[in-house]
Amino acid sequence: MDNKKIRNFAIIAHIDHGKSTLADRILEFTNTVSKRDLKEQHLDSMDLEKERGITIKLNAVQIRYNSYIFHLIDTPGHVDFTYEVSRSLAATEGALLLVDASQGIQAQTLANVYLALENNLEIIPIINKIDLPSANVDKVKAEIENTIGISAENAILISAKNGIGIEKVLEAIVNLIPPPQASDEKDPLKALVFDSYFDIYRGVIIFIRVVTGKISVGDTFKFMANNLKFSVIELGISSPNQVKKEALFAGEVGWVAASIRNAKDVEVGDTITLVENPAKSPLPGYKKLVPVMYTGFYPVDSQQYNLLKDSLEKISLSDSSIIYEPESSKALGFGFRIGFLGLLHMEILQERLEREFNLSIIATAPSVEFQITRTNGQVQIISNPSLFPEPNFISEIREPFILAKIFLPEEFLGQIMGLCQDKRGIYVDLEYIDDFRRRLIYKLPLVEVIFDFFDRLKSLSKGYASFEYEVIDYQVSKLQKLDILLNGQKIDALSMIVHKDFAYPKARDLTQKLKEIIPRHSFEVPVQAVIGSKVIARETIKAYRKDVTAKLYGGDVTRRKKLLEKQKAGKKRMKSFGVVDVPQEAFLAILKTNVNEK
């Protein structure tokens, strides 16, 4: 195949800027999918993606346009799924920068554009939704030039919803995006593994971008990270349904089935090469992202532990950022500690486990990795608050800090700065983008951001603010472990790490919430928040009382007293042996303790 006729590209856009709609129009205009078969958000295969109106998993599809072959790699736009974007950009030569004509550049768009610029991709600016009454094309063009530093003079104006300007986009892909680098078929194979998923019949299917050489059915290849060898049984392209081929050549994007049965054998971002004619070094520039938060997942039914284990293994195949290890809790039994890229990432996984594998999950409150220096000089990295040493054994605690870049209209500046101060933020800079928009830069503790920062940011700015962040370093902080006792017993899964200055209001807020959420029992349940051995907040869940005197009528009052005394003794006995039922909402209550006020 002539390399000069191939174009590989991705679409960069913020949530709701019309990326999946543009992908639909391209599929429709090129007759890749007939109008009859085309569904909205055609490349978003998960029900969750369609319901939430977001792209979670990337998708790769081959499109024929005149004599050219395009490989469109559809990418997510949410901050939690940056790792998906980095994968797709590593497999392309160009990117369509899609910006909403009424909303302009958003923080996550900018983060992804910088990723594209780092990969030396050709960027084509496209302004979408030009048919909206609130569209301001000139303002958006100026924003693109001032913020990103690329010319927007020839930006393509489109309405993806109404199909306006789609042909201009296709012509720009042909004329502006460079073809893949030429390579001889005899060159050693180098192919980037940019995605994978588990097929119950064929094992792990890997998606690759061939950079040099070629790969054919029957070839034996190896992963360069772990040297494991497999033979190609089937390979082909997605158009968007899978189409089998005999070989994939340099510049092509396709899938490979090789009877890979073990999920852990595939590492997304790895390079594959042929055993007979191996490449000397893997492809450069791929970054493996590290989880930023950790959560405990426990099956409600302890019999489902093995099902949860198998389900996580299958899902982790198509989501390489998930890291998990077994853990146990006195309150919840056996489960897993799972690393995520953010709260949305965690919610998506929990929903997938419940929908696709019929699991009922209890998720504990998220935490981050803390660096703890013990009094004997030993340094530990701990992500589970219940594993923290006692306070008298801790010399210092360091927590991860992020550099947050927040884009917002000028009118919301005061409220957003107040939010950052509430979250223990350290002011860094304020940049003026234009007459109306500002970029606010703060250093913030990561543990404060993973809870509700994104929701509160959107709420305070009426949805107009957006932000991106990167973890920069660890800093010493005055942190303490807050434990919760129910009926005198420590519930390890409810432990949390709080800043010393906010411990009392947080403890008070949490005990009040738990009092409302935990159902009443037939015995009184004290809810206590403790630091070390000191109780700093307490609430009591009153017992419900069965009317043991209902059967009495008339008669002696001593009979009534006797029954009530018997009930009282029974409750006392039940209190000492009783088990308190803790619903899922109790763990979620920790997420909603926003009290960062002294």
From Swiss-Prot:
Q: Name one GO cellular component term.
A: plasma membrane
* Entry EC no(s): 3.6.5.n1
First-listed, main subcellular location of the protein, grouped into a coarse class: membrane
Keyword Cytoplasm attributed: no
Single biological process term from Gene Ontology: positive regulation of translation
According to the UniProt record, what class of enzyme is this?
A: hydrolase
* Catalysis performed (reactions): GTP + H2O = GDP + phosphate + H(+)
Keyword Aminoacyl-tRNA synthetase applies: no
Family annotation (CDD domains)? EF4_II, EF4_III, LepA, lepA_C
Q: How does it sit in the membrane?
A: Peripheral membrane protein
Q: Where in the cell is it found?
A: Cell membrane
Per UniProt, where does GTP bind?
A: 16-21, 128-131
Xref: PROSITE patterns = G_TR_1, G_TR_2
Sorted UniProt keywords: Cell membrane, GTP-binding, Hydrolase, Membrane, Nucleotide-binding, Protein biosynthesis
Tell me where in this chain the tr-type G domain is found.
4-181
Q: Which GO terms describe its molecular function?
A: GTP binding; GTPase activity; ribosome binding; translation elongation factor activity
Give the record's family classification: Belongs to the TRAFAC class translation factor GTPase superfamily. Classic translation factor GTPase family. LepA subfamily.
Q: What's this protein's function?
A: Required for accurate and efficient protein synthesis under certain stress conditions. May act as a fidelity factor of the translation reaction, by catalyzing a one-codon backward translocation of tRNAs on improperly translocated ribosomes. Back-translocation proceeds from a post-translocation (POST) complex to a pre-translocation (PRE) complex, thus giving elongation factor G a second chance to translocate the tRNAs correctly. Binds to ribosomes in a GTP-dependent manner.
Which PANTHER family does the protein's record reference?
TRANSLATION FACTOR GUF1 HOMOLOG, CHLOROPLASTIC (PTHR43512:SF4), TRANSLATION FACTOR GUF1-RELATED (PTHR43512)
User: What name goes with this protein?
Assistant: Elongation factor 4
Species of the source: Mesomycoplasma hyopneumoniae (strain 7448)
